Amino acid sequence: MPRRREVPKREILPDPKFGSVELAKFMNVVMLDGKKAVAERIIYGALEQVQVKTGKDAIEVFNLAINNIKPIVEVKSRRVGGANYQVPVEVRPVRRLALAMRWLREAAKKRGEKSMDLRLAGELIDASEGRGAAMKKREDTHKMAEANKAFSHFRW
């Protein structure tokens, strides 16, 4: 139990172009060394590419991709009597979004395209269609949870 009062969550302002809070949050995830303008350029460039390649609304593709990547369950280590068990636990909504964004960023970084905005655009399109490295990460997480279902009674 915390000894001090709970620190309030900071409100994130929606991004200027699309008015989306999720996109503004993703911008903060992509940002390195406080360079928000660079992150903004990468994301808006990626969304432009998505619009050109798919012909669909870029923000809809982004939201669909994020929703497809969000994990429902994950495993946490729990020590019981000298043995470590991987216990499946449900993921809280805030963490779901954070994990999805982090996985999307990491998957985009590992792609082969020339610039980050092209990589991100490719990963967004793949994730919105249910494939790609970020989706594989989600499936692997779910498989781990399914495989360790027997230890779910150790939940705390």
From Swiss-Prot:
Keywords: Ribonucleoprotein, Ribosomal protein, RNA-binding, rRNA-binding, tRNA-binding. One of its GO terms (molecular function) is rRNA binding. One of its GO terms (biological process) is translation. The lineage of its organism: Bacteria, Pseudomonadati, Pseudomonadota, Betaproteobacteria, Burkholderiales. CDD domains: uS7_Bacteria. This is Small ribosomal subunit protein uS7. InterPro entries: Ribosomal_uS7, Ribosomal_uS7_bac/org-type, Ribosomal_uS7_CS, Ribosomal_uS7_dom, Ribosomal_uS7_dom_sf. Belongs to the universal ribosomal protein uS7 family. It comes from Bordetella pertussis (strain Tohama I / ATCC BAA-589 / NCTC 13251).
